[in-house]
Amino acid sequence: MDFLTDKFSLKNQPSKAGDFFMGGAGTLEHVMDSMDTESFYSKSPAVVAAAAGASKCVQQGFSAIHRAEHHVRMERASPCQENNANYGLAKVEGQTVHTELGRSMDTCCSLAVSPGKSMADKVELDELGDKCDSNVSSSKKRRHRTTFTSLQLEELEKVFQKTHYPDVYVREQLALRTELTEARVQVWFQNRRAKWRKRERYGQIQQAKSHFAATYDISVLPRADSYPQIQNNLWAGNPSGGSVVTSCMLPREPSSCMTPYSHSSRTDSPYTGFTNHQNQFSHMPLNIFFTESLLSGSANGHSFEAKPEFERRSSSIAVLRMKAKEHTANISWAM
């Protein structure tokens, strides 16, 4: 503008173009209209041509300044920034700016959302999605349970007695007769086969148990004649001693070993009860009966050779019995 005022004489001295624009009272169109009027410059052709070129340059400069300031105002009035009071005023102009940049206002706002808020929204969306998935899965798991009638079960059992694995054709025919679907018939046969296998397995277990009990049945109290008749070499080698032992140990008849000494002055002694057979059996051990069977077996000739261990045991037991009987006899004689 200083260049214009120096070269050309103006009729009036108006304010400068910068003051005109920056003051806020005028606009770019007002300035350009005032510069295009004939009364603004002198009427000479050279002045008019120079004024036209200068006005074009000024118009280009003002348009560049206007675009820059427009961008600044739109950035300040962006809807992406929170608590902006100028958003409503610059919304229309902002649409053109963001359209020129290749994105819309919604895209800008979606990019400028705070991270905390976006994470909270994401968690809520995930929870809603999980609830929807759980509802869908629960609805899928819920199955319809078929209740069979007696007629349907009768028809199914008839076919099962013939075959446990019916083919597709048989299942379809059975489904038509029972008014069921082929899938329901197939599932029934699967369950029926599983039940049949379970019963068969249980029956086999019970049969094995009964067979084991019948095979290994042992009586608790066997008879006395079931024992084998074993010969005692000690008594067979000494027949005279065997007769003495037999007469002393066997409770068949009261012998001299067991009979107490009958003294005239001691007849009323309480130890005279040894003559009673009941007292004899009560005071004698049960192994005497086993010794009797051994001795009787040797007499009948149905014996066999015993092992050395058994011989030693039987001999030691016999010696102990002899000592016990001698001690009892001595006590009875002393009485």
From Swiss-Prot:
GO terms for cellular component: nucleus. A motif (OAR) lies at residues 315-328. One of its GO terms (molecular function) is DNA-binding transcription activator activity, RNA polymerase II-specific. Coiled coil: none annotated. Residues 201-335 are annotated as: Transactivation domain. The OAR motif may negatively regulate DNA-binding and therefore transcriptional activity. It is found in the C-terminal transactivation domain that stimulates transcription. It comes from Xenopus laevis. Binds DNA as a homodimer; required for transcriptional activation. Belongs to the paired homeobox family. Signal peptide: none annotated. Its main location: nucleus. The keyword Lipid biosynthesis does not apply. The gene is alx1. SMART domains: HOX. It is found in: Nucleus. Residues 141-200 bind DNA. SUPFAM superfamilies: Homeodomain-like. Sequence-specific DNA-binding transcription factor that binds palindromic sequences within promoters and may activate or repress the transcription of a subset of genes. Most probably regulates the expression of genes involved in the development of mesenchyme-derived craniofacial structures. Keywords: Activator, Developmental protein, DNA-binding, Homeobox, Nucleus, Repressor, Transcription, Transcription regulation. GO terms for biological process: embryonic skeletal system morphogenesis; negative regulation of DNA-templated transcription; positive regulation of DNA-templated transcription; positive regulation of epithelial to mesenchymal transition; positive regulation of transcription by RNA polymerase II. This is ALX homeobox protein 1.
